[in-house]
Amino acid sequence: MIEMEILRNTVQKIAKHAIEAIDKVDEAELEMMISKIMDASSVFIVGTGRSELIGKAFAMRLMHLGFKVHVVGDVTTPAIRDEDCLIAISGSGETKTVTLAAETSRSVGATVVAVTATPESTLTGYSDVVICIPSKTKEPWKYYTSGVLRGEYDDLTPMGTLFEDSTHLFLDGLIAEFMSILGKREKDLKERHAIIE
């Protein structure tokens, strides 16, 4: 019989890490992120793997709030323009598809917001705003090894788990900020919820 000790301990570690990581987010950068999203004609979101899934969840909630939002790679996604904003999610800041999207967006004059665990990376070099959520990522392993020796990381939260879960909670918290700014309530979001699924 499973005693759920591993599950409970892991969830507690993830939750504790997320709270501590989000507390370290630079408030000035956060205010700029909010401003850039509010001012954008359209918001584009890019990520790969689990970061993409978290980005899609954020895109859905932005849509529920009335923002014009697109996920990079979807067949209906239009060209990004200078009045738009790209939210680029990558723990390492080196994911090729994400850095290429950031570079391309920057080249046409769009605003780029990086959500990353790595403040100095290829991605942040293309970014106007950097939201750093300090966490272990799937790379580089040299930081992971030293972190394990200091007792900071655990094999039960593999690769990018801490970054991805912390980012998901951060972005859901950001949705609550937008709800407050826009004076929206849950019933307002429900009006835009899908009715054909």
Swiss-Prot record:
Source organism superkingdom: Archaea
One BP term from GO: carbohydrate derivative metabolic process
SS bonds (residue pairs): none
SUPFAM superfamilies (UniProt xref): SIS domain
Molecular function as annotated in GO: carbohydrate derivative binding; isomerase activity
InterPro entries, per database record: PHI/rmpB (IPR017552), SIS_dom (IPR001347), SIS_dom_sf (IPR046348)
UniProt domain SIS: residue ranges: 33-184
Similarity annotation: Belongs to the SIS family. PHI subfamily.
Protein's UniProt name: Uncharacterized protein MTH_249
Lineage: Archaea, Methanobacteriati, Methanobacteriota, Methanomada group, Methanobacteria
